[in-house]
């Protein structure tokens, strides 16, 4: 992607996958930077942390924003070097798997609960019926899948997990057993879109709770999972405090939980949970993949009344419900009034569902097809 953005510019490119370049960067970083003058993109920079001190000196003396684009596939190593040497001198952009709008070439505008914005998204998006939505969910959104370089998603995810566990996870701790970690990931995937229950995950994975917490942190840091925290406000009482867990890529969830096809998934016991995961992750990615923070929460009180998503934006709270139905009624929006006691005013609401076109439930709530997000 960055190489595409570089086209037509004077920016150079070097990858430290090249062992000769890597050796030079490690043994003589000053000479390396003389040969690869900024502006430059240095890929897999985590292999030569010796560069960071020299990049820091350059940044302090030249004040050229964007002089160095640094990328890496091993997050822990990369971020350790950045935090140690480049704190305050670097902007960090975490790249998740692709959003559906990116895959379709429909633009990169973040999702907003605004009628004009929704109609514009509808014009650019690629329509899909229920079968088509579950095909997207099952196939996943990894770049290699989206670009059709790998037509068999099951083979891709098998290889992806082997590489991921052997390289990124084992790098953090040689003591991590690969088979146990895979069983742990399967236990986590089986609980996507649920309130986090570390005890149950640990029990299913046959590990202790401390291990489960540590391994969840690994999954979060490596950009595999994320959490929606419950919306909290001093004026709202009796709210739960446990976050809900989601995966950025539903194709990985489907592989881990062993669904054999999109058709079987659509009728299966996890169809609602994985559909919710898909919608939440897609909305989050429309923000994250443009370098913006998504202020997404969920609402649940001690009476088990719940709103799937609460989007805080532009001074209002937008409640969002996710349903598999293609004919949503006004009864689905009644729960939105639970936010009326919050100190932040309630804005427009949305039912994200299988309806074929953007529409309205009433003056304050919209119907949004899942393919539009």
State each model region's role.
Residues 1-16, 36, 217, 223-225, ...:
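A cross-kingdom feature that marks ATP-driven nucleic-acid transaction machinery
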Residues 10-39:
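Short glycine-rich substrate-engagement loop in P-loop NTPases that contacts/grips substrate
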Residues 20-22, 47-49, 77-78, 145, ...:
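Catalytic P-loop NTPase motifs of RecA-like helicase/translocase cores
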Residues 52-76, 80-85:
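Conserved catalytic/switch belt of AAA+ P-loop NTPases
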Residues 76-92, 104-109:
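Short regulatory helix/loop adjacent to the ATP-binding pocket of P-loop NTPases
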């Amino acid at each position: 992607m960055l190489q595409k953005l570089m086209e037509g510019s004077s920016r150079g490119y070097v990858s430290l996958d090249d062992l000769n370049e890597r050796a030079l960067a490690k043994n003589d970083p000053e000479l390396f930077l003389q040969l690869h003058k900024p502006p430059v993109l240095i890929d897999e920079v985590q292999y030569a942390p010796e560069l960071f001190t020299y990049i820091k000196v350059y940044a302090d003396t030249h004040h050229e924003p964007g002089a160095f684009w640094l990328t890496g596939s091993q997050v822990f190593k990369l971020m350790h070097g950045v935090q140690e040497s480049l704190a305050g001198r670097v902007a960090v952009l975490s790249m998740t798997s692709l959003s559906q709008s990116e895959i379709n070439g429909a633009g990169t505008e973040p999702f907003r609960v605004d009628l004009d914005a929704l109609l514009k998204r509808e014009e650019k998006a690629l329509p899909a019926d229920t079968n088509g939505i579950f095909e997207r969910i099952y196939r996943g959104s990894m770049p290699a899948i989206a670009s059709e370089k790998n037509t068999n998603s099951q083979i891709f995810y098998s290889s992806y997990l082997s590489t991921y566990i052997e390289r990124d996870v084992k790098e953090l701790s040689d003591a991590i057993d690969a088979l146990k970690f895979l069983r742990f990931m399967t236990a986590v995937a089986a609980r996507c879109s649920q309130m986090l229950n570390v005890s149950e995950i640990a029990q299913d994975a046959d590990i202790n709770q401390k291990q489960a917490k540590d391994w969840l942190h690994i999954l979060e840091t490596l950009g595999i999972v994320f959490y929606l925290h419950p919306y909290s406000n001093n004026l709202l009482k009796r709210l739960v405090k446990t976050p809900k867990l989601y995966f950025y890529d539903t194709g990985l969830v489907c592989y881990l939980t062993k669904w054999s096809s999109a058709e079987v998934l659509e009728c299966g016991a996890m169809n609602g949970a994985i559909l919710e995961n898909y919608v939440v992750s897609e909305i989050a990615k429309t923000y994250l993949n443009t370098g913006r923070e998504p202020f997404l929460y969920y609402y649940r009180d001690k009476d088990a009344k719940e709103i799937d998503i609460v989007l805080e934006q532009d001074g209002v709270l937008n409640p969002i419900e996710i349903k598999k139905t293609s004919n949503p009624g006004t009864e689905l929006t009644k729960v939105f009034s639970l936010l009326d006691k919050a100190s932040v005013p309630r804005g427009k609401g949305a039912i994200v569902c299988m309806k074929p076109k953007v529409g309205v439930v009433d003056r304050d709530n919209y119907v949004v097809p899942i393919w539009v997000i």
